[in-house]
Amino acid sequence: HEMAATLTAVRGAWPERRVVVAFQPHRYTRTRDCLELFADVLSSVDEVVLAEVYPAGEAPIEGADSEHLADAVAERTGRRPTVSTLEDLPAAIARTARAGDVVVTMGAGSIGRIPAKLTGRNE
């Protein structure tokens, strides 16, 4: 799975640092189909912040949203990730991350705009 491979590489590059993942699930159908896999992978990092699902034109599906994904991560780790709107995601990351942490953003939707907001760049 590409998420697991990416996070393994991050851990290998910075083994002594905490890893914080900000993840925006893409599509409700994919979130439904991959919820357990996503929860397993996200449970391997130190902290998780979730954005709401990027719907890509799909209607919501009961049980296939970021709140349910947060519950699944909490079942595995005992810590429930923060679920945030995309607009509030930079602030949620700032509240979660510490100096020296590696922050990784993942997702196929509008989360691509977040790294520039975190670094103060307007790109």
Predicted regions and their residues:
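ATP-dependent carboxylate-amine ligase
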Residues: 1-123
